[in-house]
Amino acid sequence: MNQVKMVLIFAILLFLSCVNVSAQVIKGRVTDSTTNEALSYAAVEIRSFEDDVYIGGSSTNEKGEFEFHLKGRYPKIRITVSFLGYKTIQKVYAPATEYSYLKFEMQEDSQTLNEVVVKGLSPAEKVQRLAYNVSLVETAKLKSTTMDLSNVIDKISGVKIRSTGGVGSEANVTLNGFSGRHVKIFIDGVPMDGMSSAFGLNNIPVGLAKRVEVYKGVVPIELGGDALGGAINIVTDNSRCTRVNASYSFGSFNTHKTNVYAEHTTKKGFYVSLNAYQNYSDNDYKVNIDSYTKFNEDGSNQEVKENLTVRRFHAKYHNEVAILKIGIVDKTFADRLLLGFMGGYEYKQTQNASTMDWVYGARYTTANTLMPQLTYEKRFKVLKGLHVSLNGNYNFGKSYSADTASCNYNWLGQSQPKGVPGELSYMKYRYRDHNGAANFRMALFPADGQSVSLSSTLTTFSRSGKDETAYKPTYEHPSQSMKIVTGLSYKYDYKGKWNTSAFVKHYMNHLEAYLDPEGGINYQDFSNTTSYWGGGWASTYFWGRHTQLRLSYEYALRLPTSRELFGSGDDIERGNSNLKPESSNNVNISVTANAVDLTDHRLTIDAAFQYREIKDYIRRTTNNDSGRASSQNDGRVRNLGTDLSIRYTFKDAFFVGGNFSYIDMRSLTRYVTGTQQESKNYKERVPAIPYMSVSYTHLRAHE
């Protein structure tokens, strides 16, 4: 392993030494076209010409001068200069050298003297002006860090990420009371369902993303998944420039993390990018236990109740991932046409079951990922501004779960022989988890301020395999599922002052498996297809220059995931093919207030309220006799929540913010199923859900 690390570090250094990326410097001066006097504090904004990506914004100094240092190279840029009482100027410029000096002569415009001049919006600001309750983080200042996406998302108000262990463990996202599979994760609008933990939020480096969008509650149809409790969309970085970022870190428990990102776009529109990262850790940190199994010399054992601090001894994890994309941009037939390939390997030792009462010392799993990808985008200048996009991938992955030890382990790292092999269940299970996802979107703009959008998302899952230790019919017969979620929406925007969207969604779920529908051993081919309708609306109103109000409602559904239906594959989590979809009435109210343009200071306050009432809530349970987990429908649940976020920025050089969230999630199932006996959980809080959180964030320019 040490040799592999040294080779990897050497390869990174060699790669960086062979790449020369120069920054472009853009300087300029803004003057009055009549008097030639300098115009101080004029707003200057730079965007890439090809994809309208926001690059930077500033204002002129007392001499009317501005200066930008562009990170990377851009074939063409669009510069916009605006100033109160003058006509806005836009120039498209192709920097021919590393240094450019531009002059802007502005003409007076008496019609704008009494109007408000609004600067061009960055992509982040455009998303935040939507009618949906959305929080957004841009990652430009974090590219060269070793942070992962979970570190970034965890700082957003109303969001809490809890990990089940160290490096490689599952990241459980809690969003306004909803957690786990109730919160959908997307990459460029494509669901991440079925991907291994190598592509989990706590393993993906922040450099992979351009920004992260967190939708709290109602989710737009463009994210065509069955999200009930909200959604997180990771927007990858596909800007047209040449750059390289690399990072390496090491830490406690022999933890090593490496990330390399490089991309290049030629003048003829050929694009190539490579993102490679690895994570390794022994994960041998200490944990607190209140009991353990004592092994006696005569072969007997006994449960000892004692509070101890012990070190984990079987939790090693490592993964290696490479993502290559090649294609063309800015052609007559495609704005972007990219073919991608994602390859990865993962090794994970299993220290304990779903609870810490069951300890393992030899179980492990491996997973290989081979995933081709396709991206296509085109904005048509005719046909009423038609915009079409397609994103898809398919994973030809293979996994292996091994449980062969003929002994039991305790938290002291001691072992005791047993008569039969298998710590939980004897297995050498080789299986194929093939999952695919595709998202098609089309938008049409028939008139100013109006748009019609269509989105359809397909996700498929297929598992088949063989256990080398014994014939198990449910393993060798394929288990398959297919979901199609289609949405249609209409949006109306009234002069940028008020906009509203109405949408309808259709959900289809098809399931095939070899099982006993009653949970016994009378196996048979089982097939079931269901379909449902949902819909809602979202509206936002801008009150004055600095206040935005949002109100939205949705009748939403969440279809059971492949893991909830078929299990995890390693026998730690059992499937339940009888699960029914969850349905919910969602209401969201939020307000955003900005105190801006106060010299060099900016203060932003976000406050939101959410109401959910869920039917057939899917809850994860654990069997105390085996440590296995499974899912079941649990009647009705009501959730009330609120969150508050306050952020202060000084000159774009210093940022500090605080977040507070509170939720009240309670069971409304009055009677025990099939009886008239009142449930002891009626109107009680749903267990294992954090109901209050407080966090803060600060960032200085050099960070």
Where are each of the predicted segments found?
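Short acidic/polar hinge/loop motifs at secondary-structure boundaries
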Residues: 67-69, 190-216
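Periplasmic-side early beta-strands and strand-to-turn transitions of outer-membrane beta-barrels
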Residues: 249, 266-356
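Short, acidic, small-residue-rich periplasmic hinge/interaction motif at the N-terminus
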Residues: 31-35, 42-47, 80-87, 98-141
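Membrane-embedded beta-barrel scaffold of Gram-negative outer-membrane proteins
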Residues: 542, 550-554, 582-640
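Transmembrane beta-strands of outer-membrane beta-barrel pores
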Residues: 250-252, 278-282, 330, 343-347, ...
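A beta-strand signature from Gram-negative outer-membrane beta-barrel systems
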Residues: 104, 156, 206-245
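Gram-negative outer-membrane beta-barrel transporters
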Residues: 604-613, 632-700
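Extracytoplasmic beta-strand/coil segments of soluble accessory domains associated
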Residues: 134, 150-191
